[in-house]
């Protein structure tokens, strides 16, 4: 007897239930549990969550459920900031709609494909359109795509959409849609620059922040290394070369820093690939192909640009700087140690990073404190040993502390023996109290 799927609670159409069974889904993820009921009812929602939380099915399942196959008009528009992400969403939708008895038309429109062919195909409008903001906007301007009939707009990876300069395109798309539009925005972070756009189109949206689960992977070793007064790029280069990675990805927080690091490593004789929002789609696609072919051993990337790209065989992840949003640490380091292989996640840190390292430790990350000496990693003592020693002192009995001080002073014969006897007597009393 098969287990009853917990997706039944949402009341999806039977063909969606069949698709869910075929996909092997049983238990909804946290984001699905929280947001699917509201999306089915037509609520506008901002969902702050990382990739890998089941986010895509959170919006595609209710959208497919609510589509009217009898109506040859656009009913939902889904934007994603990269061709890879848009294609992934389209493929996931097709895995569900193929079980529908009545055909649900879904069309993918992305840059780098034949625009005229897309226009010809749009002579019959699809019920669901998925694509990159630039290409969707182009087709609206060409009057080939009509979105005024759509009830729902999804902006997936909104922070990346902003970072890659697509927000104006999304603004134009939203402006052509009905006033009572259901807008679903998904983003790992909510940057300040995104907020005016959200307030323009969303009145009192529901907001949900789904915290990532820290999977304490036994295959990933989390290391931290203080840069101290050393040249950070020299140190990084020495570590990368000395570690002999199968494939190493170095993460930075900004495009500017990614350029500086990549150029600095190239100047130091390394062959380095670079992935960030200012790299044009064609070059990005070529770079990805070269990485897959192992033409590069070292990749420098920003969090936003690396999102949605599945790079196989990463043996080392290096945090050139700790991310401001610690959710990204989980996402970065989760790229290594996959499929049973071991992985190393190394963070180069400064004194100013101590608070964030402490927060990560509270989240369940166990760090190994290392340094780079004589072309190899050496293990150091716990960086918090002094603080732990101080804390231990503070919890000691004040009388015992006083006795210790006296024991260090010079005194009469057998003086230290008497002091030690008294200290042991104090400890015995304390132990009796705790019984």
Swiss-Prot record:
Chemical reaction(s) catalysed: ATP + H2O = ADP + phosphate + H(+)
Gene Ontology biological-process annotations: response to cold; RNA catabolic process
Cited InterPro entries: CshB, DEAD/DEAH_box_helicase_dom, DEAD_box_RNA_helicases, Helicase_ATP-bd, Helicase_C-like, P-loop_NTPase, RNA_helicase_DEAD_Q_motif
Superkingdom, natural source: Bacteria
Binding residues annotated for ATP, in chain numbering: 49-56
Disruption phenotype: Growth rate decreased at 37 and 25 degrees Celsius, almost completely stopped at 3 degrees Celsius. No motility at 25 or 3 degrees Celsius. Decreased growth at 42 degrees Celsius, pH 9.4 and in the presence of 5 mM H(2)O(2).
Motif (DEAD box): 156-159
Presence of the UniProt keyword Cell membrane in the record: no
GO molecular function: ATP binding; ATP hydrolysis activity; RNA helicase activity; RNA strand annealing activity
Basic residues bias (residue ranges): 404-420
Region ranges (Disordered): 383-435
Amino acid composition bias (Basic and acidic residues), ranges on this chain: 391-403
PROSITE patterns, alphabetized: HELICASE_ATP_BIND_1, HELICASE_CTER, Q_MOTIF
Residue positions of motif Q motif: 5-33
Domain Helicase ATP-binding residue range list: 36-208
Induction (UniProt): By growth at 3 degrees Celsius, and 3.5% ethanol.
Keywords: ATP-binding, Cytoplasm, Helicase, Hydrolase, Nucleotide-binding, RNA-binding, Stress response
Subcellular location: Cytoplasm
The protein's Enzyme Commission number: 3.6.4.13
Task of the protein: DEAD-box RNA helicase involved in cold tolerance, motility, and tolerance to heat, alkali and oxidative stress.
UniProt record similarity statement: Belongs to the DEAD box helicase family. CshB subfamily.
Protein name listed in UniProt: DEAD-box ATP-dependent RNA helicase CshB
Organism name: Listeria monocytogenes serovar 1/2a (strain ATCC BAA-679 / EGD-e)
Gene it is expressed from: cshB
């Amino acid at each position: 007897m098969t287990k009853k799927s917990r997706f039944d609670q949402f009341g999806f159409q039977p063909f969606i239930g069949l698709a869910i069974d075929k996909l092997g889904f049983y238990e909804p993820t946290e984001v699905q549990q929280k947001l699917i009921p509201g999306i089915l009812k037509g609520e506008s929602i901002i969902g702050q969550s990382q990739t890998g939380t089941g986010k895509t099915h959170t919006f595609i399942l209710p959208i497919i459920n609510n589509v009217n196959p009898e109506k040859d008009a656009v009913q939902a528009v889904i934007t994603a900031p990269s061709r890879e992400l848009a294609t992934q969403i389209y493929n996931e939708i097709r895995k569900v709609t193929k079980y529908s008895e009545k055909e649900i038309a879904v069309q993918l429109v992305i840059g780098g494909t034949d625009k005229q062919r897309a226009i010809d195909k749009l002579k019959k409008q699809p019920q669901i359109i998925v694509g990159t903001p630039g290409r969707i906007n182009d087709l609206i301007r060409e009057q080939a795509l009509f979105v005024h009939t759509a009830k729902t707009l999804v902006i997936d990876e909104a922070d990346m959409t902003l970072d890659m300069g697509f927000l104006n395109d999304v603004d134009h798309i939203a402006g052509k849609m009905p006033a009572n539009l259901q807008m679903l925005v998904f983003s790992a972070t909510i940057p300040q620059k995104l907020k005016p756009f959200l307030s323009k189109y969303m009145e009192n949206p529901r907001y949900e922040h789904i915290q990532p689960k820290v999977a304490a992977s036994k295959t990933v070793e989390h290391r931290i290394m203080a840069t101290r007064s050393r040249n950070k790029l020299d140190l990084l280069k020495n570590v990368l070369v000395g570690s002999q990675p199968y494939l190493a990805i170095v993460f930075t927080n900004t495009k500017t820093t990614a350029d500086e690091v990549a150029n600095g490593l190239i100047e130091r004789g390394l062959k380095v690939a670079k992935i960030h929002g200012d790299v044009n789609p064609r070059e990005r696609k070529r770079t990805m192909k070269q990485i897959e072919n192992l033409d590069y051993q070292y990749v420098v990337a920003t969090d936003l640009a690396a999102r949605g790209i599945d790079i196989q065989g990463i043996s080392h992840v290096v945090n050139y700087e700790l991310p401001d949003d610690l959710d990204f640490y989980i996402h970065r380091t989760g790229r290594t140690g996959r499929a049973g292989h071991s992985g190393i996640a190394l963070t180069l840190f400064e004194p100013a990073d101590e608070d964030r390292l402490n927060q990560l430790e509270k989240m369940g990350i166990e760090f190994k404190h290392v340094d780079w000496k004589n072309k190899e990693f050496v293990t150091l003592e716990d960086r918090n040993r002094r603080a732990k020693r101080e804390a231990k002192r503070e919890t000691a009995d004040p009388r015992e502390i006083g006795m210790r001080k006296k024991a260090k002073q010079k005194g009469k014969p057998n003086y230290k023996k008497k002091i030690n006897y008294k200290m042991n007597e104090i400890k015995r009393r304390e132990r009796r109290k705790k019984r």
